[in-house]
Amino acid sequence: MFKYIGDIVKGTGTQLRSLAMVFSHGFRKRDTLQYPEEPVYLPPRYRGRIVLTRDPDGEERCVACNLCAVACPVGCISLQKAETEDGRWYPEFFRINFSRCIFCGLCEEACPTTAIQLTPDFEMAEFKRQDLVYEKEDLLISGPGKNPDYNFYRVAGMAIAGKPKGSAQNEAEPINVKSLLP
């Protein structure tokens, strides 16, 4: 009998403690932000919408190496390589399906030219799913993005039609390795 009364007192005490806790939270600062009215805090390394950048000369950085599409775990990136008259590669089309993208950043890490960069933009809501498929024209921005001075063709030393090896900027003359042998 006393055990039964003890359980009732214990249960009532638990309920009263819960009610007091809920009531006290009514007067505290709210943790939930009302999004459109209050701005959202984004961490410095937040990964949002993907963009394609340009090099300092104004040319698009993407060389259509297809590493981003291979690194993408969900396969939302597709592109087709084309070549200019001087031998540079560029994407004939570059397509990202943002309805499948998980914003993991693996495409940004895989890109050797830093053409793909993730921005803190997260407002991409659309009424139709096909509007979330972005083409190259939608992704290409006018600026260099996070690396303003980087130019892949200056650093890589790739041969360009009409230029001998060793004549590009930041490229040393080729060394004849056989002359170094004893």
Swiss-Prot record:
Cofactors demanded by this protein: [4Fe-4S] cluster
Entry's Gene Ontology BP terms: aerobic respiration
UniProt membrane topology term: Peripheral membrane protein
Subcellular location: Cell inner membrane
GO cellular component: plasma membrane
Entry EC no(s): 7.1.1.-
Binding site for [4Fe-4S] cluster 2: 72, 101, 104, 107
UniProt keyword list: 4Fe-4S, Cell inner membrane, Cell membrane, Iron, Iron-sulfur, Membrane, Metal-binding, NAD, Quinone, Repeat, Translocase, Ubiquinone
Residue ranges of domain 4Fe-4S ferredoxin-type in the record: 52-82, 92-121
Broad class of the protein's primary localization: membrane
Origin: domain of life: Bacteria
Ligand binding ([4Fe-4S] cluster 1): 62, 65, 68, 111
Cofactor descriptive note: Binds 2 [4Fe-4S] clusters per subunit.
Gene Ontology molecular-function annotations: 4 iron, 4 sulfur cluster binding; iron ion binding; NADH:ubiquinone reductase (non-electrogenic) activity; quinone binding
SUPFAM superfamilies: 4Fe-4S ferredoxins (SSF54862)
Family matches, as HAMAP family: NDH1_NuoI (MF_01351)
Its job: NDH-1 shuttles electrons from NADH, via FMN and iron-sulfur (Fe-S) centers, to quinones in the respiratory chain. The immediate electron acceptor for the enzyme in this species is believed to be ubiquinone. Couples the redox reaction to proton translocation (for every two electrons transferred, four hydrogen ions are translocated across the cytoplasmic membrane), and thus conserves the redox energy in a proton gradient.
Family: Belongs to the complex I 23 kDa subunit family.
Record text on subunit structure and interactions: NDH-1 is composed of 13 different subunits. Subunits NuoA, H, J, K, L, M, N constitute the membrane sector of the complex.
Name the UniProt record assigns to this protein: NADH-quinone oxidoreductase subunit I
